[in-house]
Each structure stands twice: as C-alpha cells, then as structure tokens.
Swiss-Prot record:
Cited InterPro entries: DinI-like_sf, DNA_damage-inducible_DinI-like
Name this protein carries in UniProt: DinI-like protein Z3916/ECs3483
SUPFAM superfamilies according to UniProt: DNA damage-inducible protein DinI
A Pfam family that the UniProt record links to this protein: DinI
Species assigned in the record: Escherichia coli O157:H7
GO biological process, one term: SOS response
Keywords: DNA damage, DNA repair
C-alpha cells in the first residue's frame, strides 16, 4: 500500500523540525499492524490531500488511513518528542 499525504506548504513550514519524519514513522507503525508493505510519503504541496494506492480494498483502506491519520494527529503529544 502506498499512502501519499500532501500538506499545504504554509502549514508544513510551521511544523517543528523532525515532525514530518516522526509522522511518517508513526503512521507506518500504526498502519502496518493491519496492512503489509506500507509506504508512507509526506510532501509539501499547494493544498492538503490524501491518496491511497496499491491496495485491493481501496475504499476501506482509505477510510482506515483517514481515521488513523486523524488519531495520529490528535495523539501527537504522546509520540512526537521535539
């Protein structure tokens, strides 16, 4: 599964150093519990976005990734140490 998270450039510049790598690691850890061969890409773009590809159950996988991403952001104080 390939997960591409696009974060608006103006938001990305406000993130603390190391936040993008920490987010990739945490999402990979959480999503790998349910799916094999997970690749998470986080990049700066003009708009926020999410795409999930290379999976047979695309709709349910995207829903799972959206929920996991939301939970990961909410719990950032628990896993992100800067």
């Amino acid at each position: 599964m390939r997960i591409e998270i696009c974060i608006a450039k103006e938001k990305m510049t406000k993130m603390p150093n190391g936040a993008v790598d920490a987010l990739k690691e945490e999402l990979t850890r959480r999503i790998s519990k349910r799916y094999d061969d997970v690749e998470v890409i986080v990049k700066a773009t003009s708009n926020d976005g999410l795409s999930v590809t290379r999976t047979a159950d695309k709709d349910s996988a995207k829903t799972f990734v959206q929920e996991t991403l939301k939970d990961t952001w909410k719990s950032a104080d628990e896993w992100f140490v800067h």
